[in-house]
């Protein structure tokens, strides 16, 4: 989060120009994309590594790539929703944004868009939205940290997750103890693990 983005180092060949590198970079941006300096005052810019995902390790057993933590969750969730045919109960897949900053903003889960969508869905089906929420189950997909012996104090070796040992299943989330915590009931955990023979 404290990295600086490198966007250019060549300067315009004019000794009288004070910000020669900046001018050269702006000229290139305008030539290639039609971007001017004024656009930066109102633009939403996301800078990400451009390389593709690649194998990691001598045995090529791991994957490294920008955004892979989100992709490995989003893709299976979306495909599960697409491939679900004639479900007994209505199924919904939510792919959302802004998780890294506390899920704030109009596209984060702290906003009301999912709640409003579910209300509209219930109304369209002629169902009571309060009862629908009370009878709903939600699973949240994310990655977790595998045990790292370099930072052993941050893990519980006998109750933690390890790389290469399958899917991790957590009944709670949160940070700094109980801050922003959500804890699934024992009944829900039991139902999911028994139904799918997870444990």
Where are these regions (language model features)?
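N-terminal hydrophobic/helix-forming segments and targeting peptides
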Residues: 1-199
